[in-house]
């Protein structure tokens, strides 16, 4: 599974989320496992928690509408002010929430150097999202290969990751 930006977030969410299959369903599609063997994400958002993002990346990350529109808030200020209303959905939509020891490996890339805080520019694709995810994956003991332009380089490139992941 792979995706870029919000597609990366969706790919990571599916990679980490518990199986959504309903083995008792009459619908054969709903009986199928939703688990994947791995994911590649490019510039993906790993959390929608505005407080964590502001602390770890800066205000530029939470000002992007993807962070607050995803959960139905009208602005980043509205999201923070009414956090209790949006917290459950924000948490559910965040891939990092679902990381557990039984999850597949992922390979993620962020194409720009990552100053913190973001002074101006594209905070929604900041490498801090990847660093947060890698830290969580290391904590639970699963593979997260992180590439950040001009900084972190994984021991395996994305093509070799795909070959190894699908060879299993």
Where are these regions (language model features)?
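Surface-exposed acidic, glycine-flexible loop patches that form ligand/cofactor-binding
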Residues: 29-33, 96-100, 167
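Short, proline-enriched alpha-helix->beta-strand connector loops that line the catalytic pocket
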Residues: 33-37, 100-106, 140-142
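Mobile cap/lid helix-loop segments that gate and shape the active-site cleft of serine hydrolases
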Residues: 20, 50-98, 104, 125
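A short alpha-helix capping/helix-coil boundary motif
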Residues: 8, 75, 102, 110-115
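C-terminal catalytic histidine-bearing segment of alpha/beta-hydrolase fold enzymes
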Residues: 106-168
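A general alpha-helical scaffold signature found inside nucleotide-binding enzyme cores
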Residues: 34, 61-62, 128, 132
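Primarily recognizes the serine-hydrolase "nucleophile elbow" in alpha/beta-hydrolase
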Residues: 1-57
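Extracytoplasmic/periplasmic, Sec-exported soluble proteins
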Residues: 2, 6, 31, 91, ...
């Amino acid at each position: 599974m792979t995706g870029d930006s919000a597609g990366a977030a969706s790919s990571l969410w599916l990679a980490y989320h518990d199986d959504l299959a309903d083995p008792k369903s009459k619908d054969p599609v709903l009986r199928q496992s939703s688990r994947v063997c791995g994911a590649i994400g490019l510039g993906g958002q790993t959390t929608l928690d505005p407080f964590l993002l502001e602390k770890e990346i800066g205000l530029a990350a939470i000002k992007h509408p993807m962070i607050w529109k995803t959960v139905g808030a009208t602005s980043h200020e509205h999201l923070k002010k009414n956090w209790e209303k949006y917290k459950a959905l924000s948490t559910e939509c965040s891939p990092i929430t679902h990381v557990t020891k039984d999850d597949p490996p992922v390979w993620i890339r962020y194409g720009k150097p990552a100053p913190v805080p973001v002074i101006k520019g594209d905070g929604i694709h900041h490498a801090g999202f990847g660093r947060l995810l890698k830290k969580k994956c290391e904590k639970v003991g699963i593979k997260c290969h992180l590439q950040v332009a001009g900084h972190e380089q994984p021991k395996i490139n994305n093509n070799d990751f795909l070959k190894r992941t699908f060879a299993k």
